[in-house]
């Protein structure tokens, strides 16, 4: 019974780490990352569609993203969607593709993104702590049933805390690494 609780706690905690890593891809570093446009939806024949479903998105160099739609009629809709997404650049429509030129990041931009990374890390820690609470609640249910000895219950609480501490330290390391990447000139 307790092993199942640990397994669930680890599975949910792994998902929380994956969400944090995915969120980190939306933060701009010194070089462009095509994931910065992943959340943008384009009006495709009346329905919102992910940008990467209607166009090829490539990083042509360290400061430029090129978006080549599969249908040239989508150029205007893509430009509008990018402007509406407010990602800090204006789209440049050259008739065949939309280019996004990212200016060099200022120290202020880097510090702002590092602060955002810390905030994302804190949200992930809250998620891990909520997962711990759920695991502890499950152990309390087993404790009420008296189907497991008190020593096993104590070990259960200790193991849940060890798992939580492990994931919190992983999050701290991810945030530290991301901050270093963001602040590197």
Swiss-Prot record:
Database matches in Pfam families: RRF
GO BP of this protein: cytoplasmic translational termination
Claim: Cytoplasm is one of the keywords in the record: yes
GO molecular function: ribosomal large subunit binding
CDD domains: RRF
Keyword Lyase annotated: no
Superkingdom of this protein's organism: Bacteria
GO cellular component: cytosol
Function (record text): Responsible for the release of ribosomes from messenger RNA at the termination of protein biosynthesis. May increase the efficiency of translation by recycling ribosomes from one round of translation to another.
Family membership: Belongs to the RRF family.
HAMAP family in alphabetical order: RRF
Name recorded for this polypeptide: Ribosome-recycling factor
Lineage, opening ranks: Bacteria, Pseudomonadati, Campylobacterota, Epsilonproteobacteria, Campylobacterales
Gene responsible for this protein: frr
